[in-house]
């Protein structure tokens, strides 16, 4: 077995799609939280939770923290099952034990990072080279606490076997990465045939000057590179070879920065096509990097950390002229580089935005927008133009680059004598010209020169290296080691495995393809340790005859050395013999203490103890001795020094669990036993936790619960597939045999233990079943899905105290009685509703015989004065609550009944809709008005129905039942309109309107004022919206600060008769306030629209209208629709004369029945009403006021009239059509009306027939038709009472985008532009998610991006996530007359913004009344209203 096969025995890396992202390289993206950056792996469910702490914690082992620990960013090891059930446990690891072992090794290494510069650089390099730039925005760490914030290091190692698959699939991940892609330039130089001396004078002059002045070789290489790029004549072969040899000399000690001229530099030359100033681009790149290289050469990790904290490009020296002089340039945004000829100004080619560094480079801190990466296909031979890329189109891993960074630490400790951040080249555009000019092979890219020369004995990439000779000294030493191992352990088969592993040809692709030596070595050591302990290939192993081998693999010696330290060193400590051949390597490097008996650490069964020796190792002495032994092993000293830094932490983790005691001697455990020891130690910590680990293998049908620990086998007999290897591989001498310290190698577990264990399994299973039953009882309980009587579940045997049977029976009886009485009440409501809907009469006998609502049904704490539920009172309280029943003694039945209305007051839900409608994320259905108010009510319907018929459980008891319907309606008139009214008896005999009760208590305990509800009629239900919204905070101060100080003052106190003529007054307000538009923008808009209609608008200066059964909003001014001579009541009309005397509304007492009802809805006009009247009056007002009685034209046969009025000019047709779209246009209705051919709606036909035939209509119909208008009036009043107002948004299909635009403060953008920007941001955000989920989201986004497509609720969620704001959506419950919270954001620290949703089809922002709203929103709304009106009259 070769090394590759050994690693593959632990990893699932076969048959991967080379075009897909590697399985072992999960997509890690950042999710912003209030505390920091939360890293999320987007593959699937986590198997390891982030709460894992310390695996091994005792006196001899340094306490280590797991990679999945507390500080952000947190990472979770995730699992995606293969289609084949035989593969994969974790992606990249086969078993939980292997994962524990990996994590244990990795964390022991990382725990030494503060004192181990090589490990520290490996961690830094891992984070840099993998391009996880987003993980560093909020998760940066210093080298001092590197072991507590591992960022993406440990998951990459664990999932991929230390980057084995990540780096092996480098071609798939980074298609144009120079490292590991091109061939060895150095080998070509060695084999190139010279073609004579150099005959080029310029080149000879450069070389002569270099010799004369003893110039450094890097300066020589720089001069030669400049000459090659500037020359325009062919270069002879001899000259090319001489230049190549000089480059080889320079690259042997230093990598000239000029060779990196394809890298992104501030504003210069990236991605230019070959025909575009290619020569200048090459020279600029070379000089620029040459001048800046020294600034970053030799930085150590500490100073390097300081440079990483800068998030913008700073102090960049750029070349400004052909002389090579430089000038500092500091930039923080769009780069403008001023250059002198012959360098052109290139600032238009590349746009930079200040961003955190994409590779943590202290030099490059910019995000690239390349304009020449792709060119538009040119039609008809025209010149092509640059194509600008949006940020979401830039794939950073393919387009990013950085400067080389050399550190002193790696100069001293690594193979490379320096390392650099990987250079991501896309097409080698510039270097190709230079390389082709020299005639060098296409696979000899200069970046690889440094790679090859700095990798010691690793010489190739694409091919397996040739084996090295197996020297006699090595043969003897290896034979002694194997013989010693077999003699001490008796494990000849394992010795054969190790021998063949070392002998086989092979090299880890990871080891040669890495971007820095520390990362390679870290992964290499961990993988080799795992392979040495767990690989199980035994094919072809039949002897230990070393004479059959003359060669060993190129890395065999390093593998052998790792095996010596991890396996033979513990054996050497405890052996009774004296292996003299190992004394020079291990003698005097350790000290053993006395036996330390550990009786219960990790024991799963009685007697299964983990015993260990107290071992103290002098790692300094061990390092010196192993380096001195390097000659025997034929391993370079510096290689031993590097490997020791990674092996020693692993050794310290293994040694305490590497021994077991026998009666006469102590022996080293089998390597599998070491893993078992670690696993058992973990089981003590996690085996009996509240959140138990996931149990079972991963198969396509398995479902791994979220947030579970990795499986620590609690009952191995249930999973023999994971224990057969441990038991068989050790020939019965496994860890479970350590049951008795004094026993002589027991081979089996005693039967008594097995019996106790089986009994324990049964008891635990029984307890789990009982706990599940209890949970199910709590979850299933309720009465929403069951129609029968209460179901008594038979008691389940459990370890709970028994419940008194009499108590159970009593509780059952009381519950059944309560539910029955609830059924009677709701049957009454249902029967009443049915009679109203069908138009039938409600039998008087039913009213007499039906039982009244039980007094104790809703026991609430009621204030004696306000009759409202006192704050803090339990809305549903009964004696049954006092009975503390066991959770699962019986199952409460599920009945299809709704809770009493009072039960929902604490839930902020409407009374008439079940809670299920609001528990789902979808928005609730808004039932049509006709379902609750039927226009064709029978005239003789009794007015004295019980309160339940009106669904008003909280009406004051002293309110007469025979009040007109207005007594039960909301909103009510304002205080000024009714406070002087004494309430006279109407002509129809109705009782006078009672005086309003005393002010009610607000939820906070303060007395309600006039602003608590609509002034005038103090109704309890008017207090309800404020009670509901009292807990909702006002919009954030940030939103108020964002808005302009120029406020459009909609309401001015008092009526100013000397106001400007461009202002319009609306004297229809009861409280005498005048509504004006004072903004200059609004004035201009109103004046322009008024001028357009000045030929049509005729408004009487003394308007008097007759109150009839036609809704007031639709009455034509100065025209009566009722019979001539009918008694008139004054109605306020819009006056053309600002100084005119506007008649105030009549007292409330003068109105009766439907008139009172309509007046209650006719509250102070809002801005919408003003705008509506501006558009509708020209239609509803005739050309001249009628001078005499209205003449009724003859009625035609078809119900119409013989009058020749054109139907399309009927004023009420237009008015009704417009009123259907009263405040917001439901898009479907608007589209239907715009496309209408004039047939009209049913409302149009009925209203037109009434007007032309002069037919009286009942008041019930009038109320129903004006319901939409009334509802908006009620909503406006409710918002006003809470100090809120709407931001009027057009209902043109973009209402959601306009609403979010307002919240985001994007006042200068149009809704279309904001929509495009938001959808683009969502596309970028989901780019790194799981492909299946990402495709679904992108498909939905593409659908939303189409024209005339409304926004969806998902956009609100993404908007909150991307913009860092909370959005709370509320809706208007037309039946309950209150606001209902639908979707709320409860993230702590995020200020909420409020949106109101109308009938699931229109969104508008809600702001405080003093919020300044930009003029642009009002202007857009007026324009939309005007277009809507024009579409209605066409």
Curated annotation (Swiss-Prot):
Positions of region (Disordered): 724-753, 848-1087, 1111-1148, 1182-1207
InterPro entries noted in UniProt: OTU_dom (IPR003323), Papain-like_cys_pep_sf (IPR038765)
Pro residues: compositionally biased ranges: 1183-1192
All copies of domain OTU, residue ranges: 1284-1409
PROSITE patterns given in the database record: OTU (PS50802)
Gene3D superfamilies in the cross-refs: 3.90.70.80
Residue stretches of biased makeup (Acidic residues): 734-744, 1055-1069
Biased composition range(s): Low complexity: 896-915, 1002-1012
Name of the featured protein: Uncharacterized protein ORF65
Source organism (scientific name): Ictalurid herpesvirus 1 (strain Auburn)
The gene coding this protein: ORF65
């Amino acid at each position: 077995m070769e090394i590759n096969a050994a690693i593959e025995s632990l990893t699932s890396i076969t048959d991967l799609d080379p075009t897909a992202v590697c399985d072992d390289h999960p997509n890690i993206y950042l999710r912003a939280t209030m505390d920091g950056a939360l890293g999320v792996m987007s593959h699937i469910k986590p198997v390891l939770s982030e709460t894992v702490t310390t695996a091994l914690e005792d006196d001899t082992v340094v306490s280590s923290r797991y990679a999945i620990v507390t500080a952000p960013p947190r990472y979770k090891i995730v699992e995606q099952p293969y289609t084949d059930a035989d593969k994969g446990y974790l992606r990249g690891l086969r078993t939980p034990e292997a994962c524990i072992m990996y994590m244990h090794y990795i964390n022991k290494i990382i725990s030494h990072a503060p004192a181990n510069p090589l490990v520290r650089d490996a961690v830094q390099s891992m984070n840099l080279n993998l391009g996880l730039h987003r993980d560093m925005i909020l998760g940066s760490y210093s080298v001092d606490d590197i072991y507590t914030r591992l960022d993406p290091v440990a998951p990459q190692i664990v999932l991929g076997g230390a980057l084995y698959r990540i780096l092996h699939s480098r071609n798939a991940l980074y298609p144009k990465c120079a490292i590991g892609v091109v061939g060895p330039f150095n080998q070509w130089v060695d084999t190139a045939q010279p073609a004579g001396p150099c005959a080029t004078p310029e080149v000879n002059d450069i070389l002569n000057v270099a010799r004369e002045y003893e110039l450094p070789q890097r300066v020589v290489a720089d001069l030669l590179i400049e000459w090659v790029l500037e020359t325009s004549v062919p270069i002879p072969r001899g000259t090319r070879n001489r230049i190549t040899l000089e480059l080889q000399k320079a690259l042997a000690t230093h990598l000239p920065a000029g060779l990196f001229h394809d890298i992104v530099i501030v504003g210069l030359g990236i991605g230019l096509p070959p025909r575009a100033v290619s020569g200048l681009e090459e020279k600029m790149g070379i000089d620029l990097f040459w001048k800046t290289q020294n600034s970053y050469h030799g930085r150590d990790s500490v100073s390097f950390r300081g440079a990483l904290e800068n998030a913008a490009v700073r102090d960049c020296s750029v070349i400004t002229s052909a002389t090579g002089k430089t000038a500092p340039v500091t930039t923080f945004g769009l780069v403008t580089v001023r250059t002198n000829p012959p360098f052109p100004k290139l600032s238009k080619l590349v746009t930079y935005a200040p961003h955190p560094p994409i590779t943590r480079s202290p030099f490059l801190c910019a995000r690239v927008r390349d304009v020449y990466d792709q060119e538009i296909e040119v039609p008809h031979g025209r010149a092509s133009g640059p194509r600008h890329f949006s940020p979401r189109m830039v794939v950073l891993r393919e387009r990013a680059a950085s400067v080389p960074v050399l550190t002193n630490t790696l100069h001293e400790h690594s193979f490379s004598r320096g390392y650099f951040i990987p250079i991501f080249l896309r097409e080698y555009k510039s270097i190709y010209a230079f390389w082709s000019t020299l005639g060098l092979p296409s696979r000899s890219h200069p970046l690889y020169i440094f790679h090859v020369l700095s990798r010691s004995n690793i010489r190739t990439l694409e091919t397996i290296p040739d084996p090295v000779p197996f020297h006699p000294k090595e043969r003897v030493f290896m034979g002694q080691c194997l013989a010693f191992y077999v003699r001490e352990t008796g494990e000849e088969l394992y010795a054969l495995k190790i021998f063949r592993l070392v002998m086989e040809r092979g090299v880890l692709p990871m080891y040669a393809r890495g971007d820095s030596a520390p990362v390679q070595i870290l992964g290499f050591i961990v993988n080799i340790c795992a392979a040495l302990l767990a690989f199980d290939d035994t094919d072809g192993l039949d002897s230990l005859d070393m004479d059959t081998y003359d060669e060993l693999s190129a890395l065999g010696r390093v593998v052998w050395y790792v095996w010596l330290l991890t396996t033979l060193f513990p054996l050497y400590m405890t052996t009774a013999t004296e292996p003299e051949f190992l004394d020079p390597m291990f003698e005097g490097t350790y000290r053993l203490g006395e036996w330390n008996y550990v009786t219960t650490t990790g024991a799963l069964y009685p007697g299964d103890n983990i015993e260990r020796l107290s071992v103290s190792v002098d790692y300094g002495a061990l390092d010196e001795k192993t380096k001195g032994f390097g000659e025997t092993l034929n391993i370079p000293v510096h290689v031993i020094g590097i490997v020791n830094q990674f092996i020693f932490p692993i050794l310290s983790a293994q040694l305490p669990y590497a021994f077991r005691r026998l009666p006469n001697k102590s022996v080293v455990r089998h390597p599998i036993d070491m893993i078992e020891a670690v696993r058992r130690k973990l089981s003590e910590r996690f085996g009996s936790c509240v959140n138990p680990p996931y149990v079972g293998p991963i198969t396509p049908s398995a479902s791994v619960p979220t947030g579970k620990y990795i499986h620590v086998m609690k009952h191995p007999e249930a999973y023999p597939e994971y224990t057969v290897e441990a038991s068989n591989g050790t020939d019965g001498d496994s860890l479970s045999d350590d049951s008795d310290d004094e026993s002589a190698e027991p081979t089996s577990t005693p039967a008594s233990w097995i019996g106790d264990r089986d009994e324990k399994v049964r008891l635990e299973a029984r307890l789990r079943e009982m706990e599940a039953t209890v949970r199910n009882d709590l979850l299933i309980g309720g009465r929403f899905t069951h129609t029968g009587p209460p179901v008594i579940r038979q008691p389940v045997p459990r370890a709970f105290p028994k419940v008194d049977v009499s108590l159970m029976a009593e509780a059952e009886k009381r519950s059944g009685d309560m539910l029955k009485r609830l059924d009677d009440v709701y049957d009454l409501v249902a029967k009443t509703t049915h009679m109203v809907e069908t138009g039938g009469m409600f039998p008087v006998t039913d009213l007499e015989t039906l039982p009244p609502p039980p007094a104790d049904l809703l026991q609430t704490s009621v204030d004696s004065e306000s009759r409202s539920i006192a704050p803090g009172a339990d809305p549903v309280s009964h004696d049954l609550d006092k009975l503390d029943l066991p959770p699962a003694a019986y199952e409460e039945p599920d009945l299809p009944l709704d809770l009493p209305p009072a039960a929902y007051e604490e839930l902020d839900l409407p009374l008439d809709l079940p809670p299920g409608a609001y528990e789902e994320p979808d928005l609730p259905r808004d039932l049509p008005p006709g379902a609750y108010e039927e226009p064709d009510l029978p005239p003789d319907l009794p007015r004295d129905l019980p309160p339940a018929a009106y669904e008003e459980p909280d009406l004051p008891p002293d309110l007469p039942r025979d009040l007109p319907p207005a007594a039960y309606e909301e909103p009510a008139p304002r205080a000024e309109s009714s406070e002087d009214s004494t309430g006279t008896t109407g002509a129809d005999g109705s009782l006078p309107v009672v005086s309003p009760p005393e002010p009610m208590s607000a939820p906070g305990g303060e007395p309600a004022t006039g602003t608590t509800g609509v002034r005038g009629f103090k109704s309890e239900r008017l207090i309800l919206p404020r009670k509901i919204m009292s807990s909702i905070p006002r919009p954030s101060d940030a939103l108020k600060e964002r808005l302009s100080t120029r406020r459009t003052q909609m309401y001015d106190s008092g009526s100013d008769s000397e106001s400007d003529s461009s202002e319009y007054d609306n004297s229809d307000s009861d409280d005498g306030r005048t509504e004006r538009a004072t903004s200059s923008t609004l004035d201009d808009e109103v004046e322009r629209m008024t001028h357009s209609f000045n030929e049509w608008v005729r408004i009487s200066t003394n308007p008097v209208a007759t109150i009839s059964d036609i809704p007031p909003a639709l009455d034509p001014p100065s025209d009566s629709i009722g019979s001539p001579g009918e008694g008139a009541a004054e109605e306020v009309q819009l006056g053309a004369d600002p100084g005119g005397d506007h008649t105030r509304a009549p007292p409330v007492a003068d109105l009766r029945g439907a008139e009172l009802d309509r007046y209650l809805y006719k509250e102070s006009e809002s801005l919408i009403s003003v705008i509506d009247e501006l558009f509708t009056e020209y239609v509803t007002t005739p050309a001249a006021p009628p001078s005499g009685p209205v003449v009724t034209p003859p009625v035609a046969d078809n119900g119409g009239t013989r009058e020749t009025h054109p139907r399309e000019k009927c004023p009420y047709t237009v008015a009704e059509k417009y009123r259907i779209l009263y405040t917001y246009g439901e898009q479907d209705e608007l589209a239907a009306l715009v496309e209408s051919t004039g047939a009209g709606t049913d409302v149009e036909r009925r209203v037109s027939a009434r007007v032309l035939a002069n037919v009286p209509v009942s008041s019930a119909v009038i109320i129903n038709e004006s319901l939409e208008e009334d509802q908006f009036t009620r909503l406006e009043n409710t918002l006003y009472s809470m100090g809120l107002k709407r931001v009027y948004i057009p209902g043109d299909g973009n209402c959601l985008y306009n609403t979010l635009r307002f919240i985001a403060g994007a006042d200068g953008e149009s809704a279309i532009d904001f929509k495009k920007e938001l959808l683009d941001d969502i596309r970028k955000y989901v780019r790194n998610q799981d492909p299946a989920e990402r495709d679904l989201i992108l498909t939905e986004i593409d659908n939303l991006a189409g024209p005339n497509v409304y926004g969806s609720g998902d956009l609100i969620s993404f908007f909150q996530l991307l913009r860092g704001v909370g959005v709370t959506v509320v809706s208007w419950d037309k039946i309950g007359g209150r606001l209902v919270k639908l979707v709320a954001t409860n993230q702590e620290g995020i200020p909420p913004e409020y949106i109101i949703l109308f009938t699931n089809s229109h969104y508008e922002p809600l702001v405080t009344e003093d919020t300044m709203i930009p003029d642009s929103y009002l202007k857009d709304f007026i324009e939309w209203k005007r277009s809507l009106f024009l579409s209605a009259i066409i």
